[in-house]
Amino acid sequence: FSEDPLRILRGVRFAMQLGFGIDGETSSAMNALSPLLSHIAAERIKTELEKAICAEHFSAKVFSEYKSVISDSIGVDFSDLSPQLAEKCRGSEAAVCWAALLLPLGSGAAEVCRRLKFSNDLKRTVCFLTENCKNKHTADRYTVRRLIGSFGADNMLMLGKLRRLALGESETERTVLSVLDKHECCSLRDMAVNGNDLIKLGICGGREIGSILDCLLDSVLRDEVPNEKSALLNFARNKISE
């Protein structure tokens, strides 16, 4: 381990991937020498940890035998992590596995993502999941549509899965699937009208067009106006005359 500290993490990873235990003497040496991981590039640490937490045989019990290794790798106290939830999510997308492990950190998950040099996309998704997992309004249809429009369908499907596994709440996942199955409007690009339609109504200012489109979208998301061209144009005319 002294010659190549990354072998410490590889040992953890192999244990998770292959489902075998490591003898006590070796485990003790891995934990004792974990400070050497500070000499390893963050990207390589992230790669090994990700393979471990996403592994088919991930075990919270076995993972917990390497508290020093994990703490020195991630840069947070092991007690602030949630390997039990990560075990429930094993085999899921990398973002779900990371979010499950880091969920107790809340907004602090962003610092771990930065420290381990996550890609921008992975960091954005992990932070989205950790920040919204316990949001009680997430299952609301309006909120689901709004979040799909802002963060994408894939991220919302992952959020639904995480809430089901972490909280035992399936309503978010069902709502997301229902919205997607019915091809409901979730963003400006889904609306039956666009800026050109508003220009034909005599609206010329770009800022005013943007404001009215946002208002139309919000009304559609709230089911106040159907996503139909005639209804939306009538709504826009009324907004202009106000």
Which residues does each predicted region cover?
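Glycine- and charge-enriched loop/helix tracts that form the active or gating conduit
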Residues: 1-116, 207-208, 212-220, 224-236, ...
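Residue-level signal for threonine
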Residues: 23-24, 119, 187, 194
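Charged, low-complexity, helix/coiled-coil-prone segments
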Residues: 5-9, 72, 140-144, 153-158, ...
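Short coil/turn helix-boundary motifs
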Residues: 55-56, 137, 151, 205
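Short clusters of hydrophobic/aromatic residues that line enzyme substrate/ligand-binding pockets
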Residues: 1, 147, 193
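Divalent metal-dependent catalytic cores for phosphoryl transfer on phosphate-bearing substrates
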Residues: 82-170
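Charged substrate- and nucleic-acid-binding regions of tRNA-handling and nucleotidyl-transfer enzymes
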Residues: 13, 162-242
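Generic structural marker for isolated residues within well-ordered, non-membrane alpha-helices
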Residues: 11, 109, 144, 194-195
